[in-house]
Amino acid sequence: MIKSYERLKKLNKEKTRVPRTVQDTIPVDTIYKDGIFRSGNKYTKSYRFLDINYKIASGEDKNNLFLSYSDLLNSFDSSVMTKITINNRKVDIKRFKEDILIPLKQDNLDPYREEYNNMLLDKLSESDDIVQEKYITVTIFKSSIEEARFTFSRIATEFSTLFARLGSSCIELNAEERLKMLHDFYRSETEEFSLDMNDLAKKGHSFKDLITPRMSKYHNKYFEFDGKFGRVLYLSNYPGFLKDEFVSELCDLNKNLMYSMDIITIPTDEAVREVENKFLGVEKNITDWQMKQNRNNNFSAIIPYDMELQRKECKEFLDDLIVRDQRMMLCNITVVHLADSLEELDKDSETLKAVARKYVCELETLYFSKRQLDGLQTALPIGVNKLNITRTLLTESAAVFIPFRAHEIMQKGGIWYGQNAITNNPILCNKALLQNPNSFVLGIPGSGKSFLTKEEIEFLILSTNDDIIIADPEGEYDPIIKAMKGQIIRIGTNSKDYINAMDMSEGYGDSGNAIADKSQFIMSLFEQLDTNHGGISPIDRSIIDRCVSLVYQDAMKNNFIPTLKHLYGKLLEQSEPEAKSLAIKLELFTNGSLNIFAHETNVDIKSRILSFNIFNLGKQLKTMGLLVITDAIINRVNENWRKGKRTHVFIDEIHVIFENEESATFFASAWRQFRKRDAYPTGITQNVKYLLSSQQGTSMLSNSEFIVMLNQSANDREDLARLLNISEEQMGYITNAPTGSGLIKYGGSIVPFVNKMPKGLLYDLNTTKPGDRKLLIN
């Protein structure tokens, strides 16, 4: 007899009560605001844990996750009961539409909003409308709520550490969240739920009135409430070997379903004693059998196979407990699922049983109405276990029922980035919830990076009031800027649109010294002027810094707007020969034919939607143009920040900025400023190698919380895998990937996605395929 288990059974035992009302079927007496439920001296609390990408992890990563999950199971105290639950919950489509669809604004952009909304609705109809939520519920036995709170606080700290090792996180549920979970199961997600405990007390109502169905009946093999039919199944037979995909496939049913695994751990000393007693019994049986054979003069008889097997199993079990630090666990698994009709329920039950048979397991129906009720109460994450059906497992065997499958990103206020390639659910990313909103879009030509970027820009234009600024080296974004009534500033050798490279707004820079930061920018420009790529010397830096400071002092004193021409003049005034050399380098760009950045700004850059088209700049000026545009964007971001307005910045062909050290340093500083000034920067490039060849570029990419990776070249794949810790299995999603498919790194998670936009107004604006463009022109 295992004393700890018998003690728990005794504590858990309740008087048999025949429920007289629907409310009586909820085995909870009292609820507390912090999420603790009480029934007698039994206290329970639930924690939600986030899913992780187990299905697409490499073999080595899966093994590490399996070991970490085993550590989690081993951490369960033998004085508590633990329940791990997977809740297949149908999405409330009405509420989901309210969150994701773009409201119409009765302006000339509404046709685009309508098309975008129709696209989203079509994609939603293709996806599964089931979301998996995962919970761990702990049941303890204490004499007071204070003792219970202290214990749950310690458990929460342990869980937080152990789930972090798995790459997941653990969130405590309060009373409203726990009750909503039960409400959604009993009454479906379509009904509104809110909890006001003070209001309940005033009206003399029970919290159970908010969550229970209006009618419930329990039958021999199923139950029903409010027009829904349900059935509880339990796992009655386990194989000797089980694959870790079992739970994932079992919970793939696209219906309301709850899977629960109840676990009670046994202290190792009691477990060893129990196995030793069984081992002694097996040895006694073998000895008795041998003595019987000897009495019959059968001295060479071989011990029967079943006895040898029992002996071997006992020895292995003892070794596992003593040598391999495994723990004995008493487990039972229940599944409850719902359907709209009895026929549908029978069909779904057979589907679940077929999955179990595939893995040489056996799912059986709980017979009798009382058992269906007991099974339902056990399967729900309330914290009770009313089924005396347990199977003895070691930690390793229990860990095979691993509850992880694939990480989902479906956040309120998020932008649509396609569908999860594993679960087919929408991917909705809200960058505001990340530690920083810095982003990159990476992919070879033709992989769909500009198309995806344009989709994001369109969503921001149509659904927010934020400012959008684009640095467009190839003129790719002109069609959407024109269609969305934005402003295009064309900067080129024959253009009359000018941007002053010496413009400086209030609050410029991130060091607190605006002049020093502007000097860094000017140094990056001079590095672009050096055709020998030898860089600028320390003497050059000192001269530039001095002259920039003098130019701004003169400008403030004499009230004029400084330009590169003023800097050119100031360099000529200096006595050092190096200053003359710097002035000569600058001459072509101030008084010569490439002087487009040496004029005062003559264009209005206050438009909400602004694109800098530098397609006609020419190769010699393109990098310089990107730097000047970035500097102008810094000024605009600072102005918006002072007004409390968010800015989204998109910089295409960002890799060219990292071709030399000074421009890379300046841009890294700009990247930091964007984050501090509530700007969301996105860098787009097809040349990952250029980006990673710079220490600044590598740092920016590795510290960015949001990265979209489309199809990559072999070398780029390897570099990204090393930098971002991408597994071989995950790399398969960016190897010869179809257009619009790849991986999204969101915070610490990497999710495979598929994003295909149907042909229409938005597709026509976004496409860069020569065939599609030709058809549009015709």
Predicted regions and their residues:
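Extended, folded cores of ATP/NTP-driven motor/assembly subunits in large transport
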Residues: 1-404
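P-loop NTPase motor domains
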Residues: 52, 59-78, 85, 89, ...
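Hydrophobic anchor at the beta1->P-loop junction of P-loop NTPases
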Residues: 441
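Conserved lysine of the Walker
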Residues: 449
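Hydrophobic positions on the alpha1 helix immediately C-terminal to the Walker A/P-loop
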Residues: 452
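Post-Walker A helix-loop "phosphate-sensing" segment adjacent to the P-loop in P-loop NTPases
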Residues: 459-469
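A short helix-turn-beta junction within AAA+ P-loop NTPase domains corresponding to the substrate/partner-engaging
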Residues: 485-489, 696-709
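Conserved P-loop NTPase
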Residues: 724-777
